[in-house]
Amino acid sequence: MKTLYSLRRFYPVETLFNGTLALAGRDQETTGFAWWAGNARLINLSGKLLGAHVAHAGLIVFWAGAMNLFEVAHFVPEKPMYEQGLILLPHLATLGWGVGPGGEVIDTFPYFVSGVLHLISSAVLGFGGIYHALLGPETLEESFPFFGYVWKDRNKMTTILGIHLILLGIGAFLLVLKALYFGGVYDTWAPGGGDVRKITNLTLSPSVIFGYLLKSPFGGEGWIVSVDDLEDIIGGHIWLGSICILGGIWHILTKPFAWARRAFVWSGEAYLSYSLAALSVFGFIACCFVWFNNTAYPSEFYGPTGPEASQAQAFTFLVRDQRLGANVGSAQGPTGLGKYLMRSPTGEVIFGGETMRFWDLRAPWLEPLRGPNGLDLSRLKKDIQPWQERRSAEYMTHAPLGSLNSVGGVATEINAVNYVSPRSWLATSHFVLGFFLFVGHLWHAGRARAAAAGFEKGIDRDFEPVLSMTPLN
């Protein structure tokens, strides 16, 4: 393989902490990286780098399978998923596997199958990773030119990008196929408290789908996170899958335009930084989605959202006091506003008390009680169903709060109850991971730009300000 540039120019020399440890073709002298820099030693060894990536995929899939089986082994069907600290089974249940009306788990066998399939896949990936890391060719360019590459080869890089986009598009269409033809998905909005159904009347209108992208991200609007029906979600996946596949074909067939060649840095570390930036954005979006959205992440499996738990508490006490004879339409609270019901600034009838800040919550157990002007007093008096009372009481005591005391007027459990909502876990973990991926993006982007500009060795030490300062001692 012809290396198009010197290693020294693009890869800074790191300090070797252990000079005696040397592996043929993997030591500091031949790669410019010390042993602790991991896969950086394999930057120009496409075969070995393939092994590292396949092995990494094996670890990821092994975790998924093992954790899946762990959750199945610990699962208690009588308790809601969100009380059991589960993060994988809720995803499988949302896809419509093993659940029936109201989100009740009727069969755990599909979950077991999922775990076993992932374990078997991880074994295949693990074997492939070890093979390519230890036995396979060091570089792929000579033997398998289709899979070989040089980082500076812009045409090859966009071809690889295109292949990735096509795979992502196929992934989006797998959800579409599940929703349309293979048993459907769980719809929390199905009448009577949620059910699995096939999605038939897809939303394909570009004005609706792309309207989400044009919405404000702030309260009441909520950008794409505000999606609240499965027709839009599955229709969006058709659009997204189509765009990804067409974009992938485009990137395979074309070469980068001159402006793109000039605008981007074309090196392995630059591509790493772009990928980290993309993953960071995904992490932040996922954080907001799992925290606020109860359609893509049904509350039956993930527990209520924060606003939902707060509104559920107001609803629960409205039901109780109405039964005890309170006139919920006119009772005054301690602030002079309505105790149970009040009007929002725009005139809708909303729940009173601290939960007024969450007045724009939409939830399947509450929407049937709304009329054209917000909550309908006559429906609140005559139409409340037992399942709505049960669900709101359950949600009231399972707020996604990690606090020791009450927050936002929501009753939290007594200290003897060890409850952390999966929404809290998933939102927090994705925010933190998104943040660190963003820091990694800044770090690798800075190094890649410096290497491309030819000054990755750092600033000239002769002119450092500290040299002209008085020593500390």
From Swiss-Prot:
It is found in: Plastid, Chloroplast thylakoid membrane. Its main location: plastid. The modification Phosphothreonine is found at T15. It holds the Pfam family PSII. Binds multiple chlorophylls and provides some of the ligands for the Ca-4Mn-5O cluster of the oxygen-evolving complex. It may also provide a ligand for a Cl- that is required for oxygen evolution. PSII binds additional chlorophylls, carotenoids and specific lipids. The modification N-acetylthreonine is found at T15. The keyword Plastid applies. It comes from the Eukaryota. GO terms for cellular component: chloroplast thylakoid membrane; photosystem II. One of its GO terms (molecular function) is metal ion binding. [CaMn4O5] cluster binds at E367. Residues 1-14 form a propeptide. It is a multi-pass membrane protein. GO terms for biological process: photosynthetic electron transport in photosystem II. Keywords: Acetylation, Chlorophyll, Chloroplast, Chromophore, Manganese, Membrane, Metal-binding, Phosphoprotein, Photosynthesis, Photosystem II, Plastid, Thylakoid, Transmembrane, Transmembrane helix. The chain crosses the membrane at residues 69-93, 134-155, 178-200, 255-275, 291-312, 447-471. Belongs to the PsbB/PsbC family. PsbC subfamily. One of the components of the core complex of photosystem II (PSII). It binds chlorophyll and helps catalyze the primary light-induced photochemical processes of PSII. PSII is a light-driven water:plastoquinone oxidoreductase, using light energy to abstract electrons from H(2)O, generating O(2) and a proton gradient subsequently used for ATP formation. This is Photosystem II CP43 reaction center protein. It comes from Drimys granadensis. The gene is psbC.
